[in-house]
């Protein structure tokens, strides 16, 4: 029975992703459909249209298996050896700078939100 529940929850999450993709194609938005789907899920959770319990196990499962979703893209990088050898150092530098920026912005925003709630003194 657990697999049926898990499958249903994952299907519900994919429905949000597919709906986001459909909206992005219909409205010709420059935003990826998956982001629109996440936003739709956020709104649905915020207004209790979808209960957290309805997706919790499915989301936890997908997060646990997240590394499997990166394997195809990691393997695809091998196809571009020439590009990597030509721009490898530049790409590493860009990745390091962007990771640093994301980490800093996330940390600053988290601190601001916690101070706003009064959690941090």
From Swiss-Prot:
The chain crosses the membrane at residues 27-47, 58-78, 89-109. It is found in: Cell membrane. GO terms for cellular component: plasma membrane. It is a multi-pass membrane protein. The keyword Transmembrane applies. Coiled coil: none annotated. The keyword Transmembrane helix applies. It comes from the Bacteria. Its main location: membrane. GO terms for biological process: cytolysis; killing of cells of another organism; programmed cell death. Keywords: Cell membrane, Cytolysis, Membrane, Transmembrane, Transmembrane helix. Belongs to the CidA/LrgA family. CidA subfamily. Increases the activity of extracellular murein hydrolases possibly by mediating their export via hole formation. Inhibited by the antiholin-like proteins LrgAB. In an unstressed cell, the LrgAB products probably inhibit the function of the CidA protein. When a cell is stressed by the addition of antibiotics or by other factors in the environment, CidA possibly oligomerizes within the bacterial cell membrane, creating lesions that disrupt the proton motive force, which in turn results in loss of cell viability. HAMAP family: CidA. PANTHER family: HOLIN-LIKE PROTEIN CIDA, HOLIN-LIKE PROTEIN CIDA-RELATED. This is Holin-like protein CidA. It comes from Bacillus cytotoxicus (strain DSM 22905 / CIP 110041 / 391-98 / NVH 391-98). The gene is cidA.
């Amino acid at each position: 029975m657990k697999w049926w529940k898990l499958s249903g929850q994952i299907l519900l999450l994919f429905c949000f992703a597919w709906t986001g993709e459909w909206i992005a194609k219909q409205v010709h938005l420059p935003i990826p459909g998956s982001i629109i789907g996440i936003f739709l899920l956020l709104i649905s959770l915020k207004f209790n249209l979808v209960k957290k319990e309805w997706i919790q196990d499915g989301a936890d499962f997908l997060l646990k298996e997240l590394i499997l979703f990166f394997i195809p893209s990691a393997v695809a990088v091998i196809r571009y050896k020439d590009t990597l050898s030509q721009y490898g150092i530049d790409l590493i530098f860009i990745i390091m700078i962007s990771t640093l920026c994301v980490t800093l912005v996330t940390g600053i925003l988290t601190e601001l939100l916690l101070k706003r709630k009064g959690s941090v003194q």
